[in-house]
Each structure stands twice: as C-alpha cells, then as structure tokens.
C-alpha cells in the first residue's frame, strides 16, 4: 500500500481495540493517559498514528503552535520556537525570528539550521516521511524534494527566510512542523533514519523529555525544567499506559488508575456520569461516517484501467435514492445516543465560516427513494423481490471492517432499509488492512468507513477528479466544476470569496452524493476531575499538556 495513503489511513477509522491494574494516580502530580496500542517511534518524521503524533509534538516543538478559535471556527497561530514572523506583502516569502534561549535536551542551541534541515528531511523521497509531498508551495525538484538553496535564506542563527514559488498559495500550517536536531540526525544516511537508534532515545526541545519506555506497557515523559514552557505548578510527569482491551481501559478509568481515555462507547456514558471522579468531554466535528458507493465500474477498471460508470452506483439520482432509503437518524439515536449529528457534506459544522447550514438533509423517506428509482428505470420485472434494470438486478456486497461493533449494527439496518425498497444487500466482513487494499484497488462495490478530517479544510485529496494522482478519492468521484472550485480554494482569497466557494462546493457534492454522508461522530473523552486547565477542542485531547495541573 502507498506509504502516503497509509499515513492518511492511520486516522481514518475508529477501531475499538489488557493489562493489569496499577497504582492509583490520585495522590501524585503525574497524569496517566490510557492508549490502545504502543508507539513505534518518537521521531515526528515517522509519526504515522494519532498517538505517535500527539507524543512527538510534546517532545519536539515547532516554529508556531495552533489553538482552536471556537467562535470563529478556525485555527489561530501563536509563537513557539519563533517569537515572531512576518510575510512579504506579496506572500512570496515569510521571515521567522527564532527565540535565542531554546536548547536541545543535550544542551546544544536550537537554531535556524535545525529548521532548514528538518524541512529538507521531511521532503526527502528517500526518507518517505509522513509529510512527504506536501511542500508544493516551496521550490522543489521533480521528486518533490525541497530545493534548499532556493527555498531558504538563513540570515542568522535565529532568523530564517522561507521563499515560495510564484503563483503558489502558502499557508503557515503547511510549513510549521516539529523541528528535529540537525546535529543528531545528520550523522545518519537518509535511508537509515527510520531505524536510527536516536528515534528511541530522543534529544528533544519540548516541555517534555522521554524518561522511560517499557515497550507495550508505559511511555513516561518527564518535564524539561530548562524549557521556556516549564511552570513548577503544572504536571510533573505524563504517562501513556498501553491498555489494548477497551473494557480494561474503562475499568481503570473508573478506578482512577488512568486519568484520561478517548473513544468511550456511548453505552458506557451513563455509568461514567455516575462516577464522581470522572467528567466527560467531546471532540466534535472531526470524524464522519459514510457509505462508499463505487462510482466507477470495478471490472472495467481492473481489466482496462479505465473509468466507466458503475452499473449500480454510476448516476447521482440512484445514489440520492439510496441515501433517502437509509434511516441514519435511527442509528444516531439508538446506537450513538445522539453523540453526533447528521452529515450532509464533508465540510464539518465546526468550520463556521465555511459550513453551509442551509443544505437540506436527505431525510429518511423510503417512498421518495422508490419513486426516484422507478423514474430511473428500476422495477421488479420478475416479481422476485429485487428490482432490476436492463437485465441487471440491484444486488451488491456491503463490506465492513472487523473490530468495531458499530459497523455490523449499521450494516444490518442498511440491509433491512434497502430490502424494503427492493435492493438486496450482502454483508461481508474483512480485516481492516485487507478491506482498505481492496478499496484502493477499486475492487469493492460498497463499504462503510469513516474519515477523520484534517484541519484546516482539505478537499482536493479526497474529491478531485484526477484519480491517478488522488488515491484517497476511493469512490472515484469526478466533477469538473467541483475541481475548479477546489483549485480556486488552494489560493489565498478574502474570507467572503472563500466562503462562497465552499458553499458552491457543498451544493455540488450534496447533489452528486458520491457517498452517503451518515453522521459526524463525537469522540467522547473521559477525564479525571483532578486534572485542571485541560482544554478539549477539535484539535484533540492530548494538546498543550504543559498547561495541565493536578488538584
């Protein structure tokens, strides 16, 4: 599977993943976070999972950091390694002024040369980092490797100018990433960086340092008292405890053996609400569930590598009928206990300036679904209970991944809903990796999955018509008008102009219905009430931990 695709898939789906109990955390100044799996690295170059990303960003700082402005529904940048920055009037460059008091944990000063080295390595195809291919606004070669001479001007140890290509649309979020120490990693050949021993005994710049790692047990981060972020009244230790079994994590949460866990199941909410030591928060608007309809014919693609309309899902009216026929609200209420909301497009309600709240949902209406299908020429010509058209019966396989109890629940309701309008659905369960391989190869008819969306909004990777170069467009959606809108949205525009383009895109994708957008699912987070100053936002739960304190 393509490495870049794997990086995106690492945040694709909620999969509910045992460990014995330990001492209670309530009498210490440390915080214990329960996680379902161990990490594979402490190097941000290769932090492909959500937990790896969260931990490495505590160890390695970036030029700037971001916080979520809930009122505006957008990111706000604030200084971190850089104390300030300014853009050229034409956005052709940005100049960063770095702090001069930051040292790596081995005592070596952090300078602009570390920043240049980091971006160079991130973009190196030999390294194949999690960020490879995203630096299109900088000067790069044919392999997307940054041209260091053209892109960077190191004016001093603490002043760096970054230059951008003409007609590009640079954004701060595209160039601000965890900085790694040049003096440590320049000793390795680039091809050997992923297995470098210093990935596991890291020299870091953040408020935290790796204190101890017991593989598949615990990751212990201690505070870096030399960090400019250090405050003596905040937490002294942050422990990530590996507990693969969900029930065991939940039990330890209730007993106070861990202080925080994410992905709490809705059926456990009432029990936790009755626990005097636990408070519940939600991360909203980052993940939507969807039913993928393969818009292209899998047989034609497999045999000829050509894109022909799918015989069942190739026209938008049929896809709209399918959405009308599925009772999404029932699943949202009965399984998710309304911890979420119905989805209409891939743009989340958290993006207040971009989200079009006037888009009308395709609410459950099987009669309307039947009428649309009849108008499209579908009928039960042989009275066998399955509608057909031109000799093709409307029967398909709906594939779901193993390991998440929500998926078979959804699939059963979908099967029954579609049966009621004359469509036969066969449910197949596959291991996640196998299912994704088939989807990427465009072999599946239909599937249930979820996207964990990036911030800021990214549409082109998922919906652009160039299917050869857009591997995350799993359903094979193609619309040239939508393409033009996505191209324009890559350019810096006034907010009102940008808002108009987002609205137009939502109208198009809602009318085309390339997938059935099911609902936005809230990630329910359990937190021990002894933790103070913790701020749960769409950016996640494990952020800005240097601000946490313990009562």
Which ranges hold each PLM region?
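Long beta-strand-rich cores associated with HINT superfamily self-processing modules
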Residues: 527-551
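Append "and occasionally in soluble cytosolic enzymes with long acidic Gly/Pro-rich linkers
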Residues: 220-222, 229, 310-416, 504
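Acidic-aromatic pocket-rim loops
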Residues: 284-304, 408, 434-491, 544-547
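Gly/Pro-rich hinge or "lid" segments in bacterial periplasmic/extracellular proteins
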Residues: 67-72, 174-233, 237, 355, ...
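N-terminal lobe/hinge region of extracytoplasmic solute-binding protein
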Residues: 35-89, 203-204
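Ligand-site clamp/hinge motif
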Residues: 193-199, 226-271, 415, 424-426, ...
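Surface-exposed binding/hinge segments that line
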Residues: 86, 97, 133-187
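Extracytoplasmic/peripheral linker and loop segments enriched in polar/acidic and small residues
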Residues: 92, 153, 311, 316-320, ...
């Amino acid at each position: 599977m393509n490495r870049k695709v794997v990086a995106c898939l690492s945040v694709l789906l909620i999969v509910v993943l045992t460990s014995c109990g330990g001492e209670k955390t309530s009498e210490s100044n440390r915080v214990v976070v329960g996680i379902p799996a161990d990490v594979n690295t402490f190097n941000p170059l290769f932090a492909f999972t959500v937990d790896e990303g969260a931990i490495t960003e505590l160890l390695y700082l970036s030029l700037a950091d971001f916080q979520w402005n809930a009122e505006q529904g957008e990111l706000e940048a604030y200084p971190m390694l850089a104390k300030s920055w300014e853009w050229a009037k034409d956005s052709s460059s940005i100049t960063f002024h770095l702090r001069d008091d930051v040292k790596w944990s081995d005592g070596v000063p952090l300078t602009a040369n570390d920043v240049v080295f980091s971006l160079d390595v991130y973009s190196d195809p030999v390294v194949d980092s999690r960020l490879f291919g995203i630096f299109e606004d900088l000067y790069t070669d044919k392999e997307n490797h940054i041209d260091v001479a053209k892109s960077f001007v190191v004016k001093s140890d603490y002043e760096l100018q970054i230059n951008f290509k003409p007609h590009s649309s640079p954004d701060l979020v595209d160039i601000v990433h965890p900085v790694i120490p040049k003096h440590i990693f320049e000793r390795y050949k680039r091809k050997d960086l992923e297995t470098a021993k210093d990935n596991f005994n890291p020299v870091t710049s953040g408020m935290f340092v790796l204190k101890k790692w017991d593989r598949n047990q615990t990751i212990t981060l201690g505070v870096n008292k030399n960090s400019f972020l250090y405050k003596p009244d905040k937490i002294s230790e942050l422990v990530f405890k590996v507990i693969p079994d969900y029930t065991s994590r939940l039990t330890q949460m209730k007993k106070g053996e861990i202080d925080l866990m994410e992905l709490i199941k809705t059926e456990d909410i009432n029990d936790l609400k009755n626990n005097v030591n636990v408070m519940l928060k939600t991360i909203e608007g980052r993940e939507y569930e969807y039913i993928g309809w393969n818009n292209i014919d899998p047989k034609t693609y497999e045999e000829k590598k050509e894109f022909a309309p799918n015989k069942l899902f190739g026209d938008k009216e049929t896809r709209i009928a399918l959405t009308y026929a599925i009772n999404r609200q029932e699943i949202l209420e009965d399984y998710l206990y309304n911890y979420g909301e119905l989805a209409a497009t891939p743009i989340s309600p958290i993006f207040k300036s971009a989200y079009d709240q006037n888009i009308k949902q395709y609410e459950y209406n099987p009669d309307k679904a039947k009428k649309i299908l009849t108008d499209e020429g579908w009928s039960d010509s042989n009275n066998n209970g399955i509608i057909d058209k031109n000799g093709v019966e409307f029967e398909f396989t709906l594939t779901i991944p193993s390991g998440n109890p929500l998926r078979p629940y959804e699939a059963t309701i979908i099967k029954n809903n579609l049966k009621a309008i004359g469509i036969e659905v066969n449910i197949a369960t596959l291991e996640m990796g196998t299912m994704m391989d088939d989807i990427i190869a465009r072999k599946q008819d239909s599937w249930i999955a979820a996207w964990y969306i990036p911030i800021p909004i990214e549409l082109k990777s998922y919906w652009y018509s160039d299917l050869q170069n857009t591997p995350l467009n799993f359903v094979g959606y193609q619309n040239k008008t939508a393409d033009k809108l996505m191209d324009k949205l890559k350019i810096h525009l006034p907010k009102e102009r940008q808002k108009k383009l987002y609205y137009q895109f939502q109208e198009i994708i809602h009318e085309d219905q390339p997938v059935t957008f099911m609902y936005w699912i809230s990630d329910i987070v359990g937190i021990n009430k002894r933790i103070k100053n913790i701020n749960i936002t769409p950016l996640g739960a494990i952020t800005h931990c240097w601000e946490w304190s313990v009562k």
